[in-house]
């Protein structure tokens, strides 16, 4: 039995829901063959987010950690390729923190790559007709903060980990005419992502770069 830790954020920025948390709740109640799914709600708070996920890692000892976050304006599921050592918050987090141009970990390197097979994930979802695009920037808010912090602590351990951004849900996006994706499609996509991660030892070679 393999263990998968799924993390999703609480609502922030005036929203009443967060699609990442709704997705994690849905997935935690599902049964997949030979896979135990563990859900974890993450506060949108600097450093507390990292501590919450690392505590869950130590408690459950997962084989795979998939961190999920909301990305307003994106129309596809976007596996993140790299986390950078920078906090530069455009808005306050849920505890009122708003660091500007500060490192996440002062002694850490400039960046960490995801250890997920991000190109295999992207290709698998695209082949299934689910909008998916490789991303090279997780932003500079709490999503990137969590991504970097977890990679910093897990990069020497045999636990695959990485971050996935997802679009808004239709009920969030309707008022502002932003892109969205149904929860049903997100659930199907996340199931495919999990199985791709568990079944792919080495990432595949598919074009996923950008010109700018």
Swiss-Prot record:
Q: What is annotated as the active site? A: 80, 143, 165
The Gene Ontology terms for molecular function here are: pyroglutamyl-peptidase activity
Q: NCBIfam families attached here? A: PRK13197.1, pyro_pdase
Keywords on this record? Cytoplasm, Hydrolase, Protease, Thiol protease
Could you describe the subunit structure of this protein?
Homotetramer.
**Gene name per UniProt:** pcp
The entry's family comment says: Belongs to the peptidase C15 family.
What name appears for this protein in its UniProt entry? Pyrrolidone-carboxylate peptidase
Q: Which reaction does it catalyse?
A: Release of an N-terminal pyroglutamyl group from a polypeptide, the second amino acid generally not being Pro
Write down the HAMAP family for this protein, in alphabetical order: Pyrrolid_peptidase
Q: Describe the task this protein carries out.
A: Removes 5-oxoproline from various penultimate amino acid residues except L-proline.
**Compartments (UniProt record):** Cytoplasm
Q: What is its main location?
A: cytoplasm
List the EC numbers from the record: 3.4.19.3
Pfam families, alphabetized: Peptidase_C15
Q: Name one GO cellular component term.
A: cytosol
Q: Which domain of life is it from?
A: Bacteria
Kindly state a single biological-process term from the GO annotations of this entry.
Answer: proteolysis
Q: InterPro entries from the xrefs?
A: Peptidase_C15, Peptidase_C15-like, Peptidase_C15-like_sf, PGP-I_bact-type, PGPEP1_Cys_AS
């Amino acid at each position: 039995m393999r263990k998968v830790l799924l993390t999703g954020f609480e609502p922030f920025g005036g929203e009443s829901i967060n699609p990442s948390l709704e997705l994690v709740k849905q997935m935690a109640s599902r049964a997949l063959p030979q896979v135990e799914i563990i859900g974890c709600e993450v506060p949108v708070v600097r450093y507390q987010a990292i501590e919450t996920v690392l505590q869950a890692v130590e408690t459950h000892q997962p084989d795979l950690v998939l961190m999920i976050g909301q990305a307003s304006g994106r129309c596809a599921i976007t596996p993140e390729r790299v986390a950078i050592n920078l906090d530069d918050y455009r808005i306050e987090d849920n505890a009122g923190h708003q660091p500007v141009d500060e490192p996440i970990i002062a002694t850490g390197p400039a960046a960490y790559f995801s250890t997920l097979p991000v190109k295999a994930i992207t290709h698998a979802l695209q082949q299934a007709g689910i909008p998916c695009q490789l991303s090279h920037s997780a932003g500079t808010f709490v999503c990137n903060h969590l991504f970097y912090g977890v990679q910093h602590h897990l990069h020497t351990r045999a636990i695959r980990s990485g971050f996935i951004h997802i679009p808004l849900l239709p009920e969030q996006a309707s008022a502002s005419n932003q892109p969205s994706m149904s929860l049903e499609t997100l659930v199907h996509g996340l199931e495919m992502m999990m199985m791709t991660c568990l079944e792919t030892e080495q990432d595949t070679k598919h074009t996923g770069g950008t010109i700018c």
